[in-house]
A protein has these predicted regions:
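H-loop/switch region of ABC-family ATPase nucleotide-binding domains
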Residues: 131-132
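Conserved ABC ATPase "signature" region
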Residues: 33, 48-66
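Catalytic Walker B motif of ABC-type/P-loop ATPase nucleotide-binding domains
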Residues: 95-98
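ABC ATPase nucleotide-binding domains
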Residues: 170-181
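Conserved ABC ATPase signature
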Residues: 70-74, 78
Length: 181
């Protein structure tokens, strides 16, 4: 990683972090357009294909009606969806997200996880995210990675449940994972 240029890295990995500083004067559209920056020329000119891709992503992320709004005028959930749209527009093989469903209502949480699943299936993306929304994440993830007391566990969701790892992970009788489902 030390030897790769920022531009090359930006073509491989897009990220959504929990705390991101960004120019407050940007509109939703301008912030999402920044995701295409690794692919633009020295004048940062976006192609017609870039513009179409951006508009499709704004629609998919339910942001089309907000694209001219300044990011300072957004709710926390709308801003989170804007950062997710920027990562999608960056069009990298790897997407890393830290708590991507933070500030999202239930509708947009479900929509987000379905979008991430669709990107994996249709666009062959590898997506790694951290979350406390285990119920939704377990339903839509192919593989799960858990860390407890410095020990790393990785397997399919079904295998981790069948092995009883989730039951041991929570150390409580109030949370039980159904092995029959």
């Amino acid at each position: 990683i030390d030897t790769i240029t920022h531009q090359s890295f930006s073509k491989e990995v897009s990220m959504v972090l929990t705390h991101t500083e960004v120019n407050k004067d940007l509109t939703v559209l301008e912030l999402v357009q920044l995701g295409r920056q690794p692919y633009t020329n020295w004048m940062d000119v976006l192609s017609a294909e870039d513009q179409d891709f951006i508009q499709d992503t704004l629609r998919i992320c339910d942001l089309q009606d907000l694209q001219k709004r300044k990011i300072t005028q957004l709710s926390d959930g709308q801003l989170q969806r804007t950062f997710i749209a920027r990562a999608v527009v960056q069009d990298t093989p790897f997407i890393f997200l830290d708590e991507p469903s933070t500030h999202l209502d239930l509708f947009h949480k479900v929509h987000l996880y379905k979008l991430l699943k669709e990107l994996c299936v249709t666009k062959n993306k590898s997506i790694l995210f951290s979350t406390h929304d285990l119920d939704l994440a377990l339903q839509l993830s192919d593989d799960v990675m858990l860390i407890k007391e410095g020990v790393f566990y990785h397997n399919t969701t079904a295998n981790l449940i069948n092995e009883g790892l989730f039951d041991r992970f929570f150390d409580t009788d109030s949370i039980i994972f159904d092995r029959d489902r």
